[in-house]
């Protein structure tokens, strides 16, 4: 069974692909930049995995469909929420180009992971865009399965990392009114379970042309999620609700207090006043699995972080994670017309120790010279709309092309 995964370098894609391969599926991973895909993590499945390059915002960059095998299922995991104010237009264009690209090819099923958008409520640009993408995908010839998720909790997810940033760093929080909004957080493990279940050959016909809400076993407010994290960590935190923080001020609060970018903070805040609880739960009967509680999700995420086994993080998945091809063309040091200055020094360390030290730069390790100046540089970066130094790095010892490294982006590793 051949499965196409778009957004394969994203937060969900990098967690879904190993599970698909483990189950014996042949996977076509579609990415914008092959250099960013961690192919070294898939050595044992290299016979089942093909990585293809293409940008759905640039239809001319997509590979010819006659090079594709018949596709039994295609996961649509693309989003542009971190791209700025024009992300709704970008998301619609991506969906239209996806449908147009696969139109000549036999396709058994499309699976789309979106967000819960309550009927009868005025939607934010973020949630309206998610609903628009679903409508565009439904115009294709293949049956569409739409999964609508509430807040996804897992190591490296935007929601988990924002909550962790706030609770770990702020003993006292003055929180906006939207922290009393209800949601139904779901563990990333359960999300992957549902994504796998809807293409299972003996069950998939139950999900054709259907929309299914997925959530965890608890209804919580965002304040309860902050308090729940503090309880798991054994931290005393005081939360003081403030009714007068505007959406713009709330976005700035998230931006300066966490590692999130301002476009993402603005998009998130615009949706956080809307309740995202499941309106139906049919999928729990069709795909039975043990749903982790919010506390269990946090404990599992913290365990993965502590063991340095985080396979993907949200800030490596945004549009900014794509390395411009112009940078790649200029990666080689020129041989002519430059002054070459070569220096040597003797170190009381083995070759491997030196290599490990270089690959561990940044993040919690910091920088070996004038570390305070790098932190000052991070503050300056944050003040002009950059990411600052808070996002650190995905793994303390490993780097891949496209990874975030404090306020840097790795262009070759």
Model-derived features with residue positions:
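SDR active-site strand-loop-helix element
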Residues: 6, 30, 77, 110-115, ...
